[in-house]
Amino acid sequence: MTDGSAMTLRDEARAKVNLTLRVVGRRPDGYHELESVVAFADCADHLTLQPGAALSLTTIGPGAQDCGDSADNLVLKAARLLGERVPDLTTGAFTLDKHLPVAAGIGGGSADAAAALRLLARANDLAVDDPRLIEAARLTGADVPVCLPSKPCVMTGVGEKLSPLPLPRIPAVMVNPRVPVATKDVFTALGLKPGSLAVGATDVLAAPAWPEAGAPLADWVVALEAGTNDLEPPALKVEPVVGTVLEALRATAGVQLARMSGSGATCFALYADDASARAAADALCAAHPGWWVHAGSLS
């Protein structure tokens, strides 16, 4: 174990984006089985750890007031779960600089928790693939395992099965109308009963033939267009402004694909180049000054 009392460790909690999201069904225990292509954006929260101090969390930044009670934060939950599995775990004082919108379908809280686990792994000389770390991630929340590596993948099961995907860097715009959407409300609106399938008996579940490494961006757009986000219709029932965001994105010049991420309300659009993404973001900011808009890339 490393005595890290004199150093501050830093990590980024990158936003998670579901490029596709298919709800396969609902297990008897109530959890939903999913198939999702996941990428990560170049916008993030920032987390620091001062190892050796008592476990604590201070939240700062433009999104701090939206985080609620620090005692309920997933950063502390993840740290405590790891502490239950690693004897004499060195924890410390976390500071979360919150920039990503909350309850937004981009895994902000899950990304924060995953960053906390990565920082604790560094402070305690643990490998990021240590089974205890992975178990703590799984028990913290369904999106935490995919955020732990924060790399493009196909996510299946209830979020714990990850298959790497050679996704290229994709210019993109992300938009959130600053309206929180509770994941629980969206799944309730979906209305699947425990033990039921969302696919027909003749619908054979198989991994799509995704483009190989080095394939042009256009090939990936075509492959992603064949997918859906099954949570879009119920999210529109819960918060109709999602439809307004999608319409605005689909009306931008040069848009290749626009879709909702996760359970919303954040939506994204893909573009052929950075200039198109930047121009689209500028237009959206001008037309909707109250929205959160980010131009960057997914990878």
Swiss-Prot record:
Coiled coil: none
GO terms, molecular function: 4-(cytidine 5'-diphospho)-2-C-methyl-D-erythritol kinase activity; ATP binding
Keywords: ATP-binding, Isoprene biosynthesis, Kinase, Nucleotide-binding, Transferase
Cross-referenced InterPro entries: GHMP_kinase_C_dom (IPR013750), GHMP_kinase_C_sf (IPR036554), GHMP_kinase_N_dom (IPR006204), IspE (IPR004424), Ribosomal_Su5_D2-typ_SF (IPR020568), Ribsml_uS5_D2-typ_fold_subgr (IPR014721)
GO terms, biological process: isopentenyl diphosphate biosynthetic process, methylerythritol 4-phosphate pathway; terpenoid biosynthetic process
Substrates-to-products reaction catalysed: 4-CDP-2-C-methyl-D-erythritol + ATP = 4-CDP-2-C-methyl-D-erythritol 2-phosphate + ADP + H(+)
Pathway membership, UniProt: Isoprenoid biosynthesis; isopentenyl diphosphate biosynthesis via DXP pathway; isopentenyl diphosphate from 1-deoxy-D-xylulose 5-phosphate: step 3/6
EC class name: transferase
Top-level taxonomic group: Bacteria
Active site residues per record: K16, D143
Family: Belongs to the GHMP kinase family. IspE subfamily.
Annotated protein name in UniProt: 4-diphosphocytidyl-2-C-methyl-D-erythritol kinase
